[in-house]
Amino acid sequence: MSYRQNDVLIPESSYIRFNDVQLKKYYFNDVLVWQRQQKVYPGIPVAKTQNLGYSPYFTVTNLGYHIKVDAFGGTERGWGRVMLGPFSSIGYSKLFFANLHAYITNAFSKIAVSLGDINGNWVQRLIYHDTGETLGGYDVTYGSGDLFTINSANGNYYLILEVDSGATSRGLNAVIQMNGCYLI
């Protein structure tokens, strides 16, 4: 949320100084009116895509403001990951998503959202679900109220969205869709 003071607009990516101290949050009458945040997505590009299963069964659709990563489990396994970045998390301790929707309709399938490197090696798992032999049934949406504490010791990360749909011949999916990711 931006904040306007003395006709000056202070964006979320800036700082407010009070008594020579840089604030990450600013309250007025005990109400939060400004909070420093960094937009990760939209903004950072798709740095790398890895198709790890049967090629036609993995798709990525990136509109710049909405990304969809989809694995289809047909006669072969659909599996792949997308690395968005790089971005620096130094100075931030939490991460939240603006409407990240993850769902699985297939058995032997997984979804994962992680922080890691350009090669897909994760450093910190944020979201993970494995259906095992159970047929799907996973459907969760994460919003701005779902905060994830991050380890910013490294500071230079990629956001990894990974989907894996088992070869069950059922033609079912594992999907991650996201509209935004922010550091606070």
Enumerate the language-model features and the residues they cover:
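Extended extracellular/luminal ectodomain segments enriched in beta-structured repeat modules
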Residues: 87-98, 154-158
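Extracellular carbohydrate-recognition regions
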Residues: 34-59, 63
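Short coil-to-beta strand junction motifs in C2/discoidin
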Residues: 106-111, 172-176
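Short beta-strand-plus-loop segments that form exposed binding edges in beta-rich domains
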Residues: 161-170
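Intrinsically disordered, compositionally biased repeat/linker segments
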Residues: 1-37
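Short beta-strands within extracellular/lumenal beta-sheet-rich domains
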Residues: 66-91, 141-148, 173-178
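Extracellular carbohydrate recognition and processing domains
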Residues: 122-153
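Short, surface-exposed beta-strand/strand-loop-strand elements in extracellular ectodomains
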Residues: 109-120
